């Protein structure tokens, strides 16, 4: 009998049974139990049993094909593995362990709303066993409350060092629960070994849910999946709509702001800057500084000089002003430089002119101007007439002076007449006479041109 029990016994080193058991009646006894007295007959191995908690929930998942997510960092199971034990000795120490074994040697795939075999299974990784954190504990402790393996995690990382259960994706597995009699996990020998498994806990390991029904079941029953529920989504959607109605979006705010008068006021300085930059055109800034020939080539059609709508003509107010400008023109011909044309428009001199009604253009003489290269100030002072364009003939009058031409006449110089000087003039009222001891040019011959100190 002992040899038979040893052959059917559980290998503690590998934690891999030769035969599987799915009910509490299928147990394996240890030879040490033969010494148990008759008073402890109530705690014999065949009296130990286990039941699955949340069996109805597991049954719903099992009917649709349970799927469990596996990740590299590890993912907890749902539904959780939770069992209840009974028939244990209340003062004996026990350990509780869980491992996962493949159901078959096939790899599966999801096709047309069902699972089907897709080939041979991959080599199974080294078997790992998860030990319940309360191990070892007395039988009374294990039978007091349901035993939950909530901290158990599944992973597909074959190099995991966190103690998680290593599984292959698209493979089917089932958990097994082991009850071991031992006072110490490492030193004392393991005695009684009892194994339990439940068909409702079979599942397929996946990295993403394939069956939509399984997804809905997990959303509806998992307390940690409240954020994925459709009811919660509808509430959040309603809240978002309410917030959008209370506070418009940025685009709507911007549209309203652009339509408001504040936007026009804020854009006004920008338009002013653009207008000022457009004035910096050379033809517009120096329009009064160019000659008639240059004006015909570069004058813009919107230039003030090309418009003849003004019925008044600028004329000098005094002849002296024109005379001074003419003198300045003669003296500045040799002083002009290329830098004169680069002066800003703010330094232009505005001539002192007055506006008078324009006369008949047919009776006015046309004044022909010879283009000269003068400075900016010269052109501003000397050119007081409007310029013509090739396509438009403006109305203009001749520049004239309100005074006669006699003021410009200079008396002719006669032959040179020597002026005599008297040493002692008697007429003190004479103007222009200078007293000098010598009366004529011949009297200067007795003096040398240079003093003797220069010899």
From Swiss-Prot:
Residues 229-241 have a biased composition (Basic and acidic residues). Residues 57-230 bind DNA. GO terms for biological process: cell fate specification; positive regulation of DNA-templated transcription; regulation of transcription by RNA polymerase II. CDD domains: T-box_VegT-like. Keywords: Developmental protein, DNA-binding, Nucleus, Transcription, Transcription regulation. It is found in: Nucleus. Residues 308-326 have a biased composition (Polar residues). It comes from the Eukaryota. Induction: By mesoderm-inducers including t/bra, and both FGF and TGF-beta family members. FGF signaling is not required for initial expression in the dorsal marginal zone, but is required for its continued expression during mid to late gastrula stages. Maternally localized to the vegetal hemisphere of oocytes. Zygotic expression parallels blastopore formation and shifts from dorsal expression in the marginal zone of late blastula and early gastrula stages to a ventral/lateral expression at later stages. During neurula and tailbud stages, expressed in the posterior and anterior ends of the embryo. During tailbud stages, expressed in a subset of interneurons in the neural tube. The keyword Transcription applies. GO terms for cellular component: chromatin; nucleus. Pfam families: T-box (PF00907). Its main location: nucleus. SUPFAM superfamilies: p53-like transcription factors. Signal peptide: none annotated. GO terms for molecular function: DNA-binding transcription factor activity, RNA polymerase II-specific; RNA polymerase II cis-regulatory region sequence-specific DNA binding. Residues 229-276, 295-350 are annotated as: Disordered. Transcription factor required for both mesoderm and endoderm formation in the embryo; signaling determinants and concentration levels may determine which germ layer is formed. Acts together with beta-catenin to activate genes that are responsible for mesoderm induction including wnt-8, eomes t/bra, siamois, mix1 and sox17. Directly binds to promoter DNA. Patterns the mesoderm along the dorsoventral and posterior axis. Activates siamois gene transcription when alone or in combination with beta-catenin, but inhibits siamois transcription in combination with pou5f1.1/oct-25. PANTHER family: MGA, MAX DIMERIZATION PROTEIN (PTHR11267:SF200), T-BOX PROTEIN-RELATED (PTHR11267). Forms a repression complex on the promoters of the nodal/nr1 and siamois genes with the maternal factors tcf7l1/tcf3 and pouf5.1/oct-25. Interacts (via C-terminus) with tcf7l1/tcf3 (via N-terminus). Also interacts with the other POU-domain transcription factors pou5f1.2/oct-91 and pou5f1.3/oct-60. This is T-box protein VegT-B. The gene is vegt-b.
């Amino acid at each position: 009998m002992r040899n038979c029990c040893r052959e059917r016994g559980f290998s503690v080193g590998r934690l891999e049974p030769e035969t599987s058991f799915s009910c509490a009646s299928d147990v394996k006894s240890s030879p040490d139990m033969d010494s148990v007295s008759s008073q402890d007959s109530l705690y014999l191995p065949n009296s130990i049993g286990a039941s699955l908690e949340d069996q109805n929930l597991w049954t719903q998942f099992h009917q649709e094909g349970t799927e469990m997510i596996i990740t590299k960092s590890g993912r907890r199971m749902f539904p959780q593995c939770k069992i209840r034990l009974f028939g244990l000795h209340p003062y004996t120490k026990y350990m509780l362990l869980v491992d996962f074994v493949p159901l078959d040697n096939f790899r599966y795939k999801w096709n047309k709303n069902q699972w089907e075999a897709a080939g041979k299974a991959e080599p199974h990784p080294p078997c790992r066993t998860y030990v319940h954190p309360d191990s070892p504990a007395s039988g009374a402790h294990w039978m007091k409350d349901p035993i939950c393996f909530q901290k158990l995690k599944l992973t597909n990382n074959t190099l995991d060092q966190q103690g998680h259960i290593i599984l292959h994706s698209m493979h089917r597995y089932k958990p097994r629960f082991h009850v071991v009699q031992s006072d110490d996990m490492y030193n004392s020998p393991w005695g009684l070994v009892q194994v339990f498994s439940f068909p409702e806990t079979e599942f397929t390991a996946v990295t993403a849910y394939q069956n939509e029904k399984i997804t809905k079941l997990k959303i509806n029953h998992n307390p940690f999946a409240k954020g994925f529920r459709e009811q919660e989504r509808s509430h959040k959607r309603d809240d978002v709509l309410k917030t959008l109605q209370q506070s418009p979006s940025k685009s709507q705010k911007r549209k309203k702001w652009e339509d408001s008068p504040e936007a026009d006021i804020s854009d006004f300085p920008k338009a002013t800057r653009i207008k000022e930059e457009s004035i910096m055109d050379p033809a517009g800034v120096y329009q009064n500084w160019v000659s008639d020939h240059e004006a015909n080539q570069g004058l813009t059609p919107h230039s003030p000089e090309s418009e003849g709508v003004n019925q008044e003509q600028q004329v000098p107010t005094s002849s002296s002003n024109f005379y001074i400008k003419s003198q300045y023109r003669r003296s500045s011909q040799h002083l002009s430089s290329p830098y004169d044309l680069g002066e800003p428009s703010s330094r232009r001199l505005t001539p002192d002119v007055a506006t008078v009604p324009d006369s008949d253009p047919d009776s006015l003489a046309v004044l022909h101007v010879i283009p000269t290269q003068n400075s900016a100030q010269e052109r501003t002072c000397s050119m007081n007439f409007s310029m013509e364009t090739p396509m438009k003939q403006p109305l203009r009058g001749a520049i004239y002076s309100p005074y006669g031409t006699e003021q410009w006449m200079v008396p002719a110089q006669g032959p040179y007449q020597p002026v005599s000087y008297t040493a002692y003039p008697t007429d003190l009222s004479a103007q222009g006479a200078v007293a000098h001891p010598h009366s004529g040019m011949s009297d200067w011959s007795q003096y040398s041109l240079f003093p003797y100190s220069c010899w």
